[in-house]
Amino acid sequence: MNTAPDPIVIIGAGMAGLACATWLHRAGRPVLVLEAADAVGGRVRTDITPDGFRLDRGFQILLTNYPEARRMFDYGALNLRSYRSGALVRLADGEETTLENPLHAPSMAFAALASPIGTLKDKLLIGKLVAQLAGRPPEQLLAQPSVTTLAYLRNFGWSEQIIDSFFRPFFGGVYLDRELNTASNFFEFVFQQFMQSAVMVPALGMQQLPEQLANRLPAGSVRLNTPVVAVADGGRTVHLANGETLAAAAVVLATDGSATAHLLGASQPAALPLAARLTTCTYFATVGRAPSHGRRLLHLNARPGALVHNVSFSSEVSAAVAPTGQSLVSVSTHGEHGLSEEELTARLRTELVDWFGPMAAMWRHLRTYRIEEALPAYTPGHPMQQELRLSDTLFQCGDWVSYPSLNAALGTGRQVAELITKEVTS
């Protein structure tokens, strides 16, 4: 009597786990993805309110030049919507200025030179860095020795004025680290990607990314609402919270660092642990058109001490995230603020009124997301990638074992799938 081979069991249906499952399925290996939550996506989730707003769990974007994303996604099927490549920056004195990416909008190059952000030398240095990074493979950038981003910027010759008015609000938002303690090799990677990529979101929200991957897998190969309590026998046995025991050809831990540690019965992750960055995303609804006037730019706040770090008028990028006649506003606050949801909302309103005028006082609070482990920290000296293989039949993947990026989550998932395909028999 023929019996089906034991599947590769992947714990976690976030981006890394789904990427791993997709590549294994393409290689003809049976897979079973176990997810504790009620939907796929991990941190990449979109909630729909009763009145029809689509709220991503935290402000998120897709950089279309990510090598792993280009391998993984069918962009045409995602109905992508684009931000303009640049930002509107509110300076310390309250004035606003618009920065355009000159590689995406060459006609704006002279306007960029006239911007009050930075000196002429600062702007020429940006051109110098663009030229230095052009054509270099991302893995080469990430493999370099590193210092903090702040030290790198100063060593490169940029003034404190452009550091405070551009690099802190922009890259501090990317890293969730306004102090710019993140490693400089990751800065070069991110800088290169922003210069070369379109900045996009799926029209119906970021959860369309994991759903596209999950929909490629065979029916029944993703089990939701299925928490795992332990992994045993070096990755050959999986114990579920409902008492069920599953046999596996191998196990892939595609969970965050703390969940991985728990499943391994350890106080810390098996690989070098990373601290996590905290962010809070607060959503507001406004009747009629938002005050951004269709510019589709991310609004950055360079004012020291502000709780509002960046603002996105999300429905100007994709009208589908808000019901007809209303607009959706996303407000991000990074780091620990020590405020209750009510206190935070009130403080944000005060700052938003100061920025956008009295109409902001009328914006209706929809929901607040406090995301404790939004991104792993990535500081100088940290290896570009930790061990993906823990034993002959036990593996781990995710951005926390590499660097804090969707590209890393997808890439480590692919690499684990390749290891299993070559070295693990069913």
Model-derived regions: residue spans:
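N-terminal Rossmann-like FAD-binding beta1-loop-alpha1 element of flavoenzymes
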Residues: 6-33, 421
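Glycine-rich FAD pyrophosphate-binding loop
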Residues: 25-50
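N-terminal glycine-rich dinucleotide-binding loop that anchors FAD/FMN and/or NAD(P) in oxidoreductases
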Residues: 47-71
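Short beta-strand to alpha-helix junction loop
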Residues: 60-67, 141-147, 156, 192-214, ...
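Mobile amphipathic helical/loop "lid" adjacent to a hydrophobic cofactor/ligand pocket
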Residues: 66-70, 79-180, 195
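Helical element adjacent to the flavin cofactor pocket in flavoenzyme catalytic cores
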Residues: 187-242, 246-250
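Mid-domain catalytic core of redox enzymes
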Residues: 229-342, 346, 354-355, 385
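Conserved flavin/dinucleotide-binding core of flavoenzymes
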Residues: 314, 318-426
